Amino acid sequence: MLILASASQSRKKLLENCQIEFIQIASKFDETTIQEKNIFNLALELSFQKANSLSENIQNLSLPEEFNYGTMEILGCDSIFEFKGEAYGKPSNKEEAFIRWKKMSGEFGFLHTGHTLIIGNFDSTSNIFKITEIIKKTVSSRVYFSNLEDWEIKSYVDTNEPLYCAGGFALEGIGGKYIEKIEGCFSNVMGLSLPWLRENLYR
């Protein structure tokens, strides 16, 4: 069974919509400890560390009975938006969100989501989680933004939605109407590439 090592509601909803059985446990890994400058590699490393931090503490988690035996998969993800070579995480305030959207209006950027799937077996008797395989990949999607007036940007920023999203926008939320088109995996822009997960979870 699957453990989602993330507090993301978007990823949770994607899994629920696909009727994938899982439980959600947020990773407590400190992201500031990673100094990788390459955005593509950074997303991948953060996804691994999130999944790995859970795998190392699996014996201390309160898991349902069905997780006490057999195969377990721990999924870690991290999304970073890249705009003209610069990494855009979550805006720190409304002013920063507005400035970013002014720059992104009529332009495009890349949403990189690092994926790590740690597969193993947990023996509840010995309290040992034995890793059998680690699968990692960063999936990238190109996001095109509409040309927006200042009042549209302000109206969106005032909803506070941009403050909780990598890149300052949510495709599945209010921000979806400001996205012109997507090239690449659609669900990846929401934080999880479902085609990648299907390929690696059920092989």
UniProtKB/Swiss-Prot annotation:
Enzyme Commission number(s) of this protein: 3.6.1.9
Active site feature: D78 (proton acceptor)
Compartments, record wording: Cytoplasm
Keywords, comma-separated and alphabetical: Cytoplasm, Hydrolase, Nucleotide metabolism
SUPFAM superfamilies in the record: ITPase-like
Cofactor(s) required for function per UniProt: a divalent metal cation
A GO MF label: nucleoside triphosphate diphosphatase activity
One annotated Gene Ontology cellular component of this protein: cytoplasm
Chief place where the protein resides: cytoplasm
Function: Nucleoside triphosphate pyrophosphatase. May have a dual role in cell division arrest and in preventing the incorporation of modified nucleotides into cellular nucleic acids.
Annotated HAMAP family: Maf
Annotated family: Belongs to the Maf family.
Protein name: Nucleoside triphosphate pyrophosphatase
Lineage, uppermost ranks: Bacteria, Bacillati, Cyanobacteriota, Cyanophyceae, Synechococcales
